[in-house]
Amino acid sequence: MTNILIVEDEQNLARFIELELTHENYTVDIENDGKVGLDKALSKPYDLYILDLMLPNINGLEICRQIRQKTTTPIIIITAKSETYDKVAGLDYGADDYIVKPFDIEELLARIRAVLRRQPDKDVLDINGIIIDKDAFKVTVNGHQLELTKTEYDLLYVLAENRNHVMQREQILDHVWGYNSEVETNVVDVYIRYLRNKLKPFNKEKSIETVRGVGYVIR
């Protein structure tokens, strides 16, 4: 199921778009406030963001900029601003498409299909700018490839695959080292430290959070 976040302060318009997208079998969340929308965009994974520009508290350009720093997920801007420099600004801030209001809903649906088609089909996870390419067995941050051992890679991947879900040390041990492993659970802590040290130069070490007494989670 494709998950879409709409950040739009015109509630009637947002609701109309939501109904149309739901009819097309998309899952939709709506926020009418810029700050709340940004918080949601950065805390929950989506497949597409639809942003208005003129929003309370934080404008759409700033939301677009901050999302683009964290992920390559498609962004479509919908706005009444029709000047060329507004369109250029939106695209320069990282938007994939820009639609001027009022628009026909069929055009929006077509543009959504188009940007989603451009997304690669390969097995790639994007966690706050940490790009994990399973096919290529490669991890990059800000364009720089991380030199990881197989165990470090497997550990990072299993955390990323279970993003926002706290994993117990025993669960991690089973996934990375195997069910019949005689490795102690404190080895998980050691490898988490290795990973954080390699992410630290890119200020990404805090992406892996410790849940005291339980285990770890990546957000």
From Swiss-Prot:
Record key words, sorted: Cytoplasm, DNA-binding, Phosphoprotein, Transcription, Transcription regulation, Two-component regulatory system
Primary location recorded for the protein, binned into one broad class: cytoplasm
Posttranslational modification: Phosphorylated by ArlS.
SUPFAM superfamilies noted in UniProt: C-terminal effector domain of the bipartite response regulators (SSF46894), CheY-like (SSF52172)
A Pfam short name: Trans_reg_C
Entry's localization field: Cytoplasm
Modified residues (4-aspartylphosphate): D52
Residues in the DNA-binding region annotation: 122-219
Protein name: Response regulator ArlR
Gene responsible for this protein: arlR
GO term, biological process aspect, one: regulation of DNA-templated transcription
TM helices/strands, residue ranges: none
Domain Response regulatory: 3-116
Function noted in UniProt: Member of the two-component regulatory system ArlS/ArlR.
